């Protein structure tokens, strides 16, 4: 992305003006996953404020954008009401578009895709479909296998997915997102 363009593009596409952030740090203090991120939310904001292409590229390659769980704690705590979860969504889209995904984040992306495929196929989350899709994508078939029997016995892994009403509406949502 050309210098001087990504800050205005973010503002236009996401409605987030990164320059409004005055680095109070409340977003990072309230973030449930900040300690696992390579760049906590306040640092993401600062890196974008520098308008440096190296920082922008580093963010696209970072785990931070994939670890964000969009809980909106940062938005709730931000005195400037900066929508960091929307910004993180945008950064994930750009990372996918520019094929700059961090290899460590591939499992997170695989989980996202397995989750969406499960909802798309059944109209709601089907746990066994989610696990099967995730394990097939990551080729990590045996990890966590030991917890499956107890989850099954507690009714947490139904063999047949529940039917949902108005599955056509859910299909329509997925169709619209492809447009």
Q: Where are the regions that the model predicts?
A:
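Cysteine-centered iron-sulfur cluster-binding motifs in ferredoxin-type domains/subunits
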Residues: 15-34, 62-82
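Ferredoxin-type iron-sulfur electron-transfer modules in oxidoreductases and energy-metabolism complexes
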Residues: 1-13, 36-66, 81-142, 148
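C-terminal, charged low-complexity interaction regions
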Residues: 143-179
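Juxtamembrane/interfacial segments around transmembrane helices
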Residues: 69-77, 116-126, 158-172
């Amino acid at each position: 992305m050309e210098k001087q363009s990504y800050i205005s593009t973010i503002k236009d596409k996401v409605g987030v003006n990164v320059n409004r952030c005055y680095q109070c740090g409340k977003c990072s203090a309230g973030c449930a996953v900040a300690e696992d991120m390579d760049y906590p939310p306040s640092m993401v904001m600062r890196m974008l404020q520098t308008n440096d292409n190296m920082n922008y590229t580093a963010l696209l390659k970072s785990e931070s954008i994939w670890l964000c769980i969009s809980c909106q704690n940062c938005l709730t705590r931000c005195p400037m009401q900066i929508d960091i979860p929307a910004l993180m969504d945008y950064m994930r889209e750009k990372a996918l578009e520019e094929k700059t995904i961090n290899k460590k984040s591939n499992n997170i992306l695989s989980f996202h895709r397995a989750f969406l495929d499960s909802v798309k196929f059944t109209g709601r989350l089907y746990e066994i479909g989610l696990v099967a899709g995730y394990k097939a994508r990551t080729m990590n078939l045996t990890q966590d296998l030991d917890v499956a029997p107890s989850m099954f016995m507690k009714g947490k892994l139904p063999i047949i997915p529940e039917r949902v009403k108005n599955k056509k509406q859910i299909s329509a949502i997925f169709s619209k997102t492809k447009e």
